[in-house]
């Protein structure tokens, strides 16, 4: 079994920053996708760093990435044990077990799906999380069918509202709070496009067999739509380490620690995790 000083799980902003901070140790970075960058790679909108898109910011982060780090792309970490071993599965590695001295968890967060919400009805075609549609549009050039309804007026919900409106779709945003919670930059789409915003309400039911036809709000408003995006929030994705407790060799950083609104905070946490892991190694290098 090959041993690594530090195992980093996740190749988004936090994982990249952690890897760069602990270069010099024997490091393995496992990323389930085929490229470093995480969710940044599907963000064409600006607002990262100095008015950069997420794609540009990811390119900047990965510039001068340490060649000494073992990079395992298209690799999933299936399990981690309290004995400091991890089971990996990937295209290049196959199914392989490794051991480590320090673990950095940088697995990010995941969207709350429709199945976790109290919305009645079957699940016809046309329902996506906002992030899924962002990926489809920005990476694969797919334009969904309108009209569109978006549940949630946070940052991601309004980013997608603006993007759909720009693509020519009629868009309605439903927000359960009395006002939208997005930052001012992302709220601008409500002024630039004829986007309907319904606050103080939520969805109670979806309609359609085979294909989505519409949805009804809790207050009884029927909204015809062919596309429904769920932007109901994000949850840290740290189930992989839930059974480990809080050992001093585990460092949780970025959005799997707590969901951040600014990528700079994610990068900072990743760097700090890398430095802490390196310090814990002490004289073992």
Indicate residue ranges for each PLM-predicted region.
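Residues forming the flavin
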Residues: 1-285
């Amino acid at each position: 079994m090959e041993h690594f000083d530090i195992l980093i799980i996740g190749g988004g902003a936090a994982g990249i920053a952690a890897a760069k901070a602990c270069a010099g140790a024997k490091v393995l970075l496992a990323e389930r996708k085929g490229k470093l960058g995480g969710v940044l790679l599907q963000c064409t909108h600006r607002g990262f760093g100095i008015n950069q898109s997420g794609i540009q910011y990811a390119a900047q982060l990965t510039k001068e990435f340490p060649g000494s780090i073992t990079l395992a792309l298209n690799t999933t970490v299936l399990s981690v044990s309290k004995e400091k071993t991890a089971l990996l599965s990937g295209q290049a590695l196959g199914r392989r077990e490794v051991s480590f001295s320090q673990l950095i968890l940088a697995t990010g967060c995941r969207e709350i799906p429709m199945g976790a919400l109290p919305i009645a009805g079957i699940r016809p075609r046309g329902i996506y999380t906002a992030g899924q549609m962002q990926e489809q549009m920005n990476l694969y050039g797919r334009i969904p069918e309108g009209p569109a309804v978006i549940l949630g007026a946070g940052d991601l919900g309004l980013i997608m509202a603006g993007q759909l409106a720009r693509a020519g779709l009629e868009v309605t945003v439903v927000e359960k709070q009395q006002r939208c919670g997005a930052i001012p930059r992302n709220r601008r789409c409500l002024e630039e496009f004829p986007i309907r915003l319904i606050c103080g309400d939520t969805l109670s039911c979806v309609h359609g067999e085979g294909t989505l036809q519409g949805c009804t709000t809790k207050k009884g408003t029927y909204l015809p739509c062919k596309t429904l995006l769920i932007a109901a929030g994000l949850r840290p994705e740290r189930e992989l380490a839930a059974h480990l407790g809080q050992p001093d060799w585990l460092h949780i950083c970025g959005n799997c620690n707590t969901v951040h609104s600014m990528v700079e905070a994610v990068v900072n946490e990743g760097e700090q995790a890398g430095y802490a892991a390196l310090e814990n190694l002490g004289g073992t290098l």
